[in-house]
Regions:
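Class I (Rossmann-like) S-adenosyl-L-methionine-dependent methyltransferase catalytic domain
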Residues: 1-18, 46, 60-131
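Hydrophobic aliphatic residue packing
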Residues: 8, 29, 51-54, 65
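A short acidic, Gly/Pro-enriched loop at the edge of an enzyme's catalytic core
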Residues: 16-29
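Surface-exposed loop/turn positions
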Residues: 25, 58-59
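A short SAM/SAH-binding and catalytic strip from SAM-dependent methyltransferases
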Residues: 27-42
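Short conserved AdoMet
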Residues: 39, 56, 104
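A short glycine-rich, Lys/Arg-flanked "PGG" loop and its adjoining helix->strand segment in the class I
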Residues: 45-57
Length: 131
């Protein structure tokens, strides 16, 4: 079994602030449901621009989000925009239009809907390429 400890550096960030990364440093950024956290639309635009900043030309921003087809969408306490709180946890849900509104500087390659888990959760896998 390979030990990857020497190859992986784990750091904690407040993603609402500038990332401690050089410009055009990465070929790709992947996040699973990060954009679904309790982030405002402006926070999401700012995060997207930070990802744009750290990606190399033609780099990819690949992410998953819960979408409006999810069974929990519009359940719980509405917290503004497309955010709903259930059991003390806020989830930001995405329409295809909201995904496309985050394309500043990117070209969308694909938006693929899929199910996750036994509920199941309804997610979208988004692949965007930096222009």
């Amino acid at each position: 079994m390979n030990n990857l400890d020497d190859l992986i550096k784990v750091e904690n960030y407040d993603i609402r602030k500038k990332l401690n990364c050089d410009n055009e440093n990465f070929q790709a950024c992947y996040s699973h449901m990060l954009f679904c956290m309790a982030l405002t639309n402006q926070d999401l635009k700012d995060l997207n621009q930070e990802i744009f900043r750290i990606l190399k030309k033609d780099g990819f921003n690949i992410y998953t989000v819960r979408n409006h087809m999810d069974g929990d969408f519009k359940k719980g306490t509405h917290r503004g925009e497309d955010m709903y709180e259930m059991n003390g946890f806020i989830v930001h849900y995405f329409s295809e239009n909201k995904i496309k509104n985050l394309l500043d500087g990117f070209t969308n390659i694909s938006i693929e809907n899929f199910d996750e888990g036994s509920f199941p959760r309804k997610l979208s896998l988004v692949i965007n390429k930096k222009k």
